[in-house]
Amino acid sequence: MSSLPDFCGLWIFAVFGSLGAASLGSFYVTLGYRILEYDYGKKRKILSFREKWRRIFTSPSACDHCGKEVRYPELLPVVGYLITKGKCKSCKKDIPKFFPIVEFLFVCIFLFCFLITKNLPFSFVFLFLCGHLLISCLTDARYFSLDYENLPWIFCFGMFSVFLLNGKIPGINEVYVFGGFFLCFIALFFLFPGGIGFGDVLFAPVLAMIAGHPWWMFFLNASYVPAVLFTIVFRKKGSSIRKTPIPMGIYFSLGILLTFFCKILFNADLLPFSIFSELENPNL
């Protein structure tokens, strides 16, 4: 009986946290699409820097097709999509399924992190990192471009997530990881022109540093193995894999996401990796 209040409290936090996670997912997917519209689209050249960001953050949600403003309860994450049956009430055009999918995934990520770690601050801060990774995925998928303005946010929320999860900030080993990745990627950038973008040179070392030592090895494989496999499967017939552009922002984001998931499971003794145990705890 003594564990009942703790059990109830856990699920109360889980329920209300899920609502916050869905709202955060809705915010970031909307932010990502607005950045595509105002920072990469035609409006980029006709609006001042200040006006552009004012519209990105303050413009009311509206249908992409007819411009009709969306109001509650249609604005509610996931639920709003079900209420409208996936169509705009004004023009009857389809609402992208990507919106409710992202909102639902944010809830799933929050529940996974919170129910395993019981660490509410980490579970929420990690969602902010996921939101900025989502923006990188959207810009790279659409324009093969990684937004440099997004990188400081990824670094800050990534470092904060590591601190909240591990209880300590990255140390000298992570600095070495950053330096090693940067030197390797900058060498590849100059030795093989057109092979990788400069965004990869900047993003990969930061994400590897967030992954930490020895998890950078997992991050590297979790990024490049799917990238190569998906490129081989989905490239145009007859085209060379070397000449096929790869949106590495998507795969780097997937890699760091999987790295955090595995670290969470590893810390909870649900995913034993003997080699990582020895590297992280050399005295054992």
Language-model segment annotations:
Residues 1-284:
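A membrane-topology feature that recognizes alpha-helical transmembrane segments
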